Amino acid sequence: MSGQTPSWLKSSILFSKKVSEATKAQIKTVFPVSDFKPNTMHLGHPLLISHRDKSKAYNFIYQKFKSRLTLTKANLLNHAGRLTLIQSVFASIPIYYMNNMLFSKKLLAKITAIVRTFWWHGIQKDQHKKPMHYRSWDAICKTKNEGGLGIRKLELVNKGMLINTAWRLVYDSNSIVAKIIKAKYFPYASLWTAPTYVPKSTFWASILSIRHHLEKHVTIQLIEGNTSIWNQPWCPMWKDMHNLLNLEQTNYQIPDKISDLWMTNTKEWDACKITTLFGQQTLDVLLQIPLIPGDGPDILCWKPASSGICSSKSAYRVLATEEAANNPPACIPVQVLQILHKVWPDKSIQPRVKTFAWRLLRLALGTASRVHKKIPSIHEACSRCGNIEDEKHLFFECSFARAVWFASSIGLRVDALPSLERGLHIQIATILQQGPSQATTGMIFSIMWCLWKARNDLRFNNLNWSIDRVLHEAMAIDNAYCLPIQPGYESQHTHTPPPISNWPIPGATNAANTHMEDELKIFCDASVCLQNSPGSNQIGIGILVLSKSTRNVSSASFFQVAIRRTLEPLEAEARALLLGAKLAVALNLQVATLLTDNQVLASVIQARSPRTQPGHWSLRPVIAEFQELASKR
């Protein structure tokens, strides 16, 4: 006992409806606290959600978003600043709450509307008209590689964090929270088979709503076989094991754990028992499941992550990928993506110019012609020459733009560019490919950015920029962010994988191989032909054996093997290395050097810790078998 006493003024008590008044009074004589109020908050979170509409209970999050916009003077930020604020501040406000509750679509729509409006227009006070959005929110929430801005969808963030919470309940089943949840909601089952019909809290209802997402992307790697056959996702047909069980047979007892399906004192499937209990089809499936040598409990793995550990970030990516597969995005020209892939990683380009480049290439600028289509009262004519103002006219066809390009250090003649009918991105790509050395990505978009600023000043402030001012501002913007590249930076990134060190085999004899030298090099490689349909990859393994006496490759020994099992490329490389090790053992080699062109695989073998450092969770069975093979020699 610490001897400390609670603060009774800050404490309150909540009784169940079935507690009598006499019992309440008796308890209050011991604990002098007030009754609990439904609107009590703790650390900014409501302790009791009494509203039938959960969005009302969490309406304070919506108010936080609105107040944060006002405090940060959002209207003073350009689009780059708004993007940074959205990604850093706005995304962090609801994180604590999203870990514990699945927000309603209504609440998420209200919050998303704030963020979306803020990105396009900032905060417009006393404006009740719906602002114009030139690109869909789905397009903006795509990754930068896919042509978006990388803003995360709140709905997917919410589900991803709940998936991570559910993962922790299963992965760390000995934690206090996991034990409490199990005792309350599934004392005689697992999270995977927990019933959904029992009375549940908001937290547990949220976990159950995303359970199928977690179940779809986990697997269990078998070591000791201590996993239950009936309520764990250990094989593709685990949910049907009860239906497949042959209750009429009397030769075997009904098994409980996976190890009960192994032969006695071995880690090999008991084919006769499995066939008798569950049928031949079940046996065919189980024979494809690798068994990891060694001791230790079975390992739950999150398949999308190389570490096998689930995180909210990894879960978000999985959900985003699934959503994109169900809702294919609009086709974006290849040239647009190629230009954006040059713009985003270029540290010499200012962030405001980068976001402008995105709006320009994705046709999301508020040009007069685009605004006129939605608001006919706004004229679509150019403020300088009176022609229809779109991107092509504003940046290349207008006489002012032509003069700016020709007077710039690029010395560009717009007449020499391809037809503008093919799209603005074609002209920009042509300048980047065929222009002089001064036509850098940063300079091109800095000039276009200043042309856009000049247009806005003339249209809204009646300020006319000169050609010299446009060029001077563009030069200043382009030079301001030119960061010096440290010498030798690129040389630090090499891709030559080190070979695996010599692998000694103690106790081996060399009598049967006197014609071969001790120093033998075994090159192991795998080839994977990826197919469109999942589970149909074609795998081939090649082994090349070279000794000191081998003068050229044509006289070396070469083995090739086709694998019927479907493997991922990394696991196929590991299988090739394991086959090379088995070949060395079969040849009774004293010393052999195994070589692979896979850096991850080489590092894992040298680390000698397949359980804790497998490199990739799928490598754990192969690496464990490799090390067991070495230890037995």
Task: Locate predicted features.
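A helix-boundary/hinge signal
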Residues: M1-L579, L583-T596, V600-R611, L619-R633
